[in-house]
Amino acid sequence: MKIKQKHVIIGLLMAILMAAFTLRTANIKNIPAGIYPDEAQNGVDAQLANSTGEYKLFYESNYGREGLFINLQALSIKTFGPTEFALKIWSIIFGTLTVLGVFLLASELFQNKIAGLIGAYLIAFSYWAINFSRIGFRAIMVPFILSFSFYFLFKGLRTKKLHDFVIAGLIYGLGVHTYIAFRVSPLVLVALFISLLITRKNFIANYWKHTLVFVVALFITAAPMLFDFFIFNPHHYASRTSAISILNPEVNQGKLVSSIAKTFALSLQKYVVMGDLNMRHNYPPYALLNPLTGVAFLIGLFYIIYKIINLLWLRFRKDIRNEKLDIYIFLFAWLIALLIPEFLASEGNPHALRSIGTLPAVIIISIIPFMWVLKKYNSFGHGFRIFVISSAIATFAFIAIADPVKYFIYFANSPKQHEVFDANLRVVSDYIKAINPSQEKFIVTGSMQRLPIKYLNPNISNTFYFYPGEVQNISPSNTDSAIFIFTGADWDAINYLRTKFPNMTFQDHRNSFGDTFYTLKN
């Protein structure tokens, strides 16, 4: 590659990374409008870990969560305090680095840096990627782990350098510490291994050391969690999954095949037809991909399916080996395998969070039509070249505008977004901060709803939490200064306390987005 061309590519990559970082950090305090209780549970666990010094491999609350992300959040909370930024900075970092990972992996797979730039561009401006890079969920680590580990793996297959396999294994082994969906990813390695046996003569003889090094390296980083899952705490491994698994006869009601067919169809169509209907995961009812990327993905998917069939036929009927088969099988296996956590679950499909491991694969598959046009460009006539250039400019402009506008204008200003992120709980948190610390504050709320308030206000004194069914146990020491705060319309609890303290004034607090809470005070 020429020096000038290299500098241009580096410059474009840096511009894409800067755009990605900006989209993942802009107004992070207020978009999303609240801290969802699942995020806050991470924060509360991280605060407890900081106070006790017990940083765990696995946190059992909230159905159980792998500890790596929470422990990183503990570090940022210790540094920045109990803020939205501290809770989400690691999502921002991993989300931005995944853009770099896709660039590296796509460049390696296509042996073309332009392919890498296109992939980086598509994921940088993707609503799906932006959204989960701005929420404090551990799942955002999965695309990061997979893109970088697979990059070094394919680089090692090309260079035969052992250190690439070591790095690939060490990164891949960390994946078991991230999110439950990662656990199906070994199926991708199995499919790739079979493909390598098919396409390369004497693969085992030539690569047995490299394979061994990769496996040993991944076990080094995975070992602590594997020991926890399979020796010390087997119940950790099974947490969260069995109750919603479509393999459970109580769930599929004896219709396993038809149930899987239905959930698989829902999982696959979400990229281009109807996306996740949960506004925390997507902007419903729109597909996960913008229309142009969605079309590119469909074309790319049909292309790799055709090439897999074609190259397998050539291999077994005419003994023609083509190493590109490895790439096609790898991408297809990645897509299908990382869909398994979604389509084997019975609830909430389509589900953009459970399938987040497919994100890099979907983006890389979407690169294929762009590369076909680029390859054919020189064979086009002058007039058609102008048309192609104009279309490319319009396409990339649309991609850069469509999803950011959807996120920062439509999503950000949607009252529904405030509702699904429990934004009223952050309003309550801000309200509490303005109250004299000496005043008793009785917060009537549910177990999960109290978590954002606790996370944002860990040190405010005279704050007491009660369930709506426990209000009869509330006994303020000074009724003149006590304040009762209700995060929801629990009218039985509200009316009970209004009757018990008739001199207090009831107030409905409601902003323009509909974020609501209630108070009872003198």
Annotate each language-model stretch with its function.
Residues 3-8, 108, 113-114, 159-161, ...:
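Membrane-interface helix-loop-helix junctions at transmembrane boundaries of multi-pass membrane enzymes
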Residues 42-50, 79, 156, 174, ...:
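Transmembrane-lumen/periplasm boundary regions of multi-pass, lipid-linked membrane glycan transferases
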Residues 89-110, 147-148, 152, 299-306:
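Transmembrane-helix motifs of polytopic, lipid-linked glycan transferases
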Residues 132-133, 184, 324-377:
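Hydrophobic/aromatic-rich transmembrane helices and adjacent perimembrane loops
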Residues 134-139:
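Short acidic/glycine- and proline-prone juxtamembrane loop motifs at membrane-interface regions
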Residues 147-165, 175:
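Membrane-interface transmembrane helices that cradle and orient dolichyl/undecaprenyl
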Residues 293, 383-437, 444-470, 512-514:
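Membrane-proximal, lumen/periplasm-facing interface regions of secretory-pathway glyco-
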Residues 470-522:
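Aromatic/acidic, Gly/Pro-rich catalytic loop(s) in extracytoplasmic/lumenal soluble domains
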